[in-house]
Amino acid sequence: MVSKVSVTRRAGRVRRKLKAVATERPRLSVYRSSKHIYAQVIDDVKGHTLAAASSLDKDLREKLKTGADVDAAGVVGKLIAERAKKAGIDKVVFDRGPYIYHGRVKALADAAREGGLEF
């Protein structure tokens, strides 16, 4: 089992590299729980959330069988891309946090790219 310390370190390494690479772009942050997936576009300079989507949104809850599969992640990815575009954002930096770029995280990223976000 992975300890909380190693998960926190891994997330910190990822975020430190992101801040070094892209300071002017907002960050597309992903959180994955055992039952749902969440995504938000964050402006780190101001500390504001510009757009957010999750498998808990009322529109999606009725459509999705579960919030914990690859299909749900794809729908959330399309929704976050749509909301970010509406907020005037088209270029972001993808923050996978401590999660491996595989499965639900990859599905969300691919759907966000298809939706028009560039990262």
From Swiss-Prot:
One of the record's GO cellular component terms: cytosolic large ribosomal subunit
Molecular function via GO: 5S rRNA binding; structural constituent of ribosome
Species annotation: Chelativorans sp. (strain BNC1)
Purpose of the protein: This is one of the proteins that bind and probably mediate the attachment of the 5S RNA into the large ribosomal subunit, where it forms part of the central protuberance.
Gene3D superfamilies: 3.30.420.100
HAMAP family in alphabetical order: Ribosomal_uL18_B
InterPro entries: Ribosomal_uL18_bac-type, Ribosomal_uL18_bac/euk
Superkingdom assignment: Bacteria
CDD domains: Ribosomal_L18_L5e
Subunit architecture: Part of the 50S ribosomal subunit; part of the 5S rRNA/L5/L18/L25 subcomplex. Contacts the 5S and 23S rRNAs.
NCBIfam families the UniProt entry points to: L18_bact
Alphabetical keyword list: Ribonucleoprotein, Ribosomal protein, RNA-binding, rRNA-binding
Family note: Belongs to the universal ribosomal protein uL18 family.
Gene, per the UniProt record: rplR
Gene Ontology biological process terms from the UniProt entry: translation
Protein name: Large ribosomal subunit protein uL18
Stored PANTHER family: 39S RIBOSOMAL PROTEIN L18, MITOCHONDRIAL (PTHR12899), LARGE RIBOSOMAL SUBUNIT PROTEIN UL18M (PTHR12899:SF3)
